[in-house]
Amino acid sequence: MAVARKIRTLLTVNILVFVGIVLFSVYCRLQGRSQELVRIVSGDRRVRSRHAKVGTLGDREAILQRLDHLEEVVYNQLNGLAKPIGLVEGPGGLGQGGLAATLRDDGQEAEGKYEEYGYNAQLSDRISLDRSIPDYRPRKCRQMSYAQDLPQVSVVFIFVNEALSVILRSVHSVVNHTPSQLLKEVILVDDNSDNVELKFNLDQYVNKRYPGLVKIVRNSRREGLIRARLQGWKAATAPVVGFFDAHVEFNTGWAEPALSRIREDRRRIVLPAIDNIKYSTFEVQQYANAAHGYNWGLRCMYIIPPQDWLDRGDESAPIRTPAMIGCSFVVDREYFGDIGLLDPGMEVYGGENVELGMRVWQCGGSMEVLPCSRVAHIERTRKPYNNDIDYYAKRNALRAAEVWMDDFKSHVYMAWNIPMSNPGVDFGDVSERLALRQRLKCRSFKWYLENVYPEMRVYNNTLTYGEVRNSKASAYCLDQGAEDGDRAILYPCHGMSSQLVRYSADGLLQLGPLGSTAFLPDSKCLVDDGTGRMPTLKKCEDVARPTQRLWDFTQSGPIVSRATGRCLEVEMSKDANFGLRLVVQRCSGQKWMIRNWIKHARH
């Protein structure tokens, strides 16, 4: 039986080789782009899958060698598709192995493309669409095996005015590094790009290179990343959907661990670990394993993995994460719909990635970073949708806070230094999202902080926050001054975080941005140590005598040091910025006003 099977296998392979040579000859005579060649490549992939279990290890290696040769013959012909549009396919060339690359003629044109794309697009055009990148998976990951019946995945890329070579490298990379039986389709969602080459050239290339595999969805108007991803979800047909920025490259073996974890629990959202593609040289750099967190402004950031993961000592183990950075995530398609997708009432992008993390955890699901599944990502210096992106990030953050954060929503308003009533931001109608939370029977945000994100600092004892002005100089606000300095100053009021002042029930008067998490320094305390006329800013825990950091303050009244009885006041000085200096001295009746008072329930 084994001999007969071997004969049948080799006969099949030789027939395929013969057919490939014949088709290649026909191609040369007709000088066209034969669709038969494309079908042979697809057939070759199916043959690989069908015969993966046939014969001994030696048989399989021999078969794969013959198939590799056939694929090389066909691939060399298809490589011609990239040349007419000025791009490079196949092995070799600049940047192989994820190494840094440069161009000798990197000049004014490259500078213009930097401004347009936020990365070196001219260099990207010279790097192969099929380049290899380093395998940064932990060693244990490479020894793992997975079930044969994993679900298929639809991979969705969102782009707007991206460089064509970067988009196509993302597509090539996912096709090259995903087993054919697992990759159902690739969906490109064009969020109404202006770039002409992203129309005809892109269509023609993917239709010839990947017929039936790659679909393009085009938005008739600019929707923003959030709603563009929803369009990709609607177009997807596989049981699992992976959402990615269109400027990524996939590591070998990225799909199997992600699909395996979702197969175990469909309520689990998996985040491939992120490595970096340097925007200037396209060097692929390894990032340390990290969870994804955020500050009280709901801006995402990398954070240290949970202590239980560190104690485990297994770099291949999944990392519990409170939220996601947002450039890549994989999710069961039906489950994503069940929990409400991304909030369609949010605009452009920013905050939706944090909101999804809160919602998944509070509503019975989970989210994890998977070190065995890795994707390299370009951190661009310039991003699309740049106009008013801070406004949209603020708007989306307030929307998430109103739905999911209960009384802790005050922290988001504090972080943005805006009032809770009439904040000057219309975050839209959230009634449908509140109904979703009720329908899903979700837990409280307090539960989430205690069980998922205990690293967050809470400021429940805050009585009042915002800009603080003196009656003697009402156009100027208390300001933390230089970040690394120890002197509070008066500065023209601008409402940003350096002028965020918080007064707590304990009597602390703190200046500067919220520390948010245990990984970040907290805002400093205003201190009167009694030794001079100038108040200082110190880390609250470093103040020698606790009373030196305590103040009495009432609206439209003085600010009085509990340690010395002196008042914080303003004096005119030719030597000070804007002619105004902060001092502590005998009280003269000066009054201070702070912008926002809150009533905070104890938790």
Curated annotation (Swiss-Prot):
Per UniProt, what is the membrane topology?
Single-pass type II membrane protein
Q: Which Gene3D superfamilies match?
A: 2.80.10.50, Spore Coat Polysaccharide Biosynthesis Protein SpsA, Chain A
Q: What is its EC number?
A: 2.4.1.41
Has keyword Transmembrane? yes
Keywords, in A-Z order: Disulfide bond, Glycoprotein, Glycosyltransferase, Golgi apparatus, Lectin, Manganese, Membrane, Metal-binding, Signal-anchor, Transferase, Transmembrane, Transmembrane helix
**What is the enzyme's class at the highest EC level?**
transferase
GO MF terms, alphabetically ordered: carbohydrate binding; metal ion binding; polypeptide N-acetylgalactosaminyltransferase activity
Q: Which GO terms describe its biological process?
A: O-glycan processing; protein O-linked glycosylation
- Binding positions for substrate per the UniProt entry: 191, 222, 380, 385
Mainly resides where? Golgi
Question: Where would you find this protein in the cell?
Answer: Golgi apparatus membrane
Q: Which InterPro entries match?
A: GalNAc-T, Glyco_trans_2-like, Nucleotide-diphossugar_trans, Ricin_B-like_lectins, Ricin_B_lectin
Which regions span the lipid bilayer? 7-29
Cite a GO CC annotation: Golgi membrane
One Pfam family this sequence matches: Glycos_transf_2
Entry-listed glycosylation sites? 460
Which cofactor names does the annotation list? Mn(2+)
Q: What is known about the tissue distribution of this protein?
A: Specifically expressed in brain. Not expressed in heart, placenta, lung, liver, skeletal muscle, kidney, pancreas, spleen, thymus, prostate, testis, ovary, small intestine, colon and leukocyte. In brain, it is expressed in cerebellum, frontal lobe, temporal lobe, putamen and spinal cord, weakly expressed in cerebral cortex. Not expressed in medulla and occipital pole.
Q: Which residues lie on this side of the membrane: Lumenal?
A: 30-603
Q: Where is the stretch described as Catalytic subdomain B?
A: 318-380
Q: Which family does it belong to?
A: Belongs to the glycosyltransferase 2 family. GalNAc-T subfamily.
Its biological purpose is as follows: Catalyzes the initial reaction in O-linked oligosaccharide biosynthesis, the transfer of an N-acetyl-D-galactosamine residue to a serine or threonine residue on the protein receptor. Does not glycosylate apomucin or SDC3.
What protein name does the entry list? Polypeptide N-acetylgalactosaminyltransferase 9
From which organism does this entry originate?
Homo sapiens
Gene that codes for this?
A: GALNT9
